[in-house]
Each structure stands twice: as C-alpha cells, then as structure tokens.
Amino acid sequence: MEAVYTPEQMRYIDAHSGVDVAVLIRRAGYAVAQTALRMLGGSYGKHVIVLAGKGNNGEDGRVASDFLRARGVKVSVFSSSEMPTQLPECDLVIDAVYGTGLRSDFVAPTTKAPVLAVDIPSGIDATTGECRGVPLRANETITFGG
C-alpha cells in the first residue's frame, strides 16, 4: 500500500477545506451512489446493502442509500451495531463502516456479492495497511480528498 495522505492529514484537509462537512458528505454520498449504479449496471430490480458506521464514513453510505432509493434501487442499511454475520442475498454491498477511522479489529460479515468500499475496506488500517481482524474484500474502493 502506498499512502497518498495519512488519516491525520485527511482529517486536517477536511477540517480546513472551507467547505461545510455536510456538503462534503453529500458530495461523497452522490459519488458512492454513482459508482454503485455503474457497478450494478443499472437500477431496475437491484438490491444493495449498505453497512454504515457511526462516523462520517457511515454518513457517506446513508446519503448514498438515499440517492440509490431515488433511482429505484431496493436498499437495506445495517448499522455497525446491528450487522449480521451473514448478509442476505443482494447485488452489491457498500462498505461504509470505518473508512480511515478504524480503531479496533473488525470481523466482516460474509457475502457473495461484490463490495464497494468507501475510503478503504473496513478492517484495514489506513496508516499501516495491515489487516485488523477479518476485513471485507472490496471489488472497488472509492475515496475522496486532496
């Protein structure tokens, strides 16, 4: 893994960007939704599961879920506190649990669906690149900043 910015540098950039955090989250959520639609190949009859953490990464996922619903996608959102060990069948999983804010080990739920990670797959330490627990294996990762 080659770091472009450390998590601390990204927090500094976000805090000093001059853009309200709600605007940044809305922009990120829209970009996540657009990437998800591309990965799905459309919206008709599709089911997406969003795994949403407590912080801004989780908010990115929740905002993406609103955009996807507006496009007709069936969306199920699981908060980090109610995440099952085995995910129901779906067409895509959006991993918005931790992002760069991982502080402890993470055991990902199992899924056969492709995974879109927001910032970095949950369970991977953004500073060291090391696995912390059992991370989700992302098919694609979308990140923002710089």
Place the predicted regions along the sequence by residue.
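Positively charged, low-complexity intrinsically disordered leader regions
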Residues: 1-45
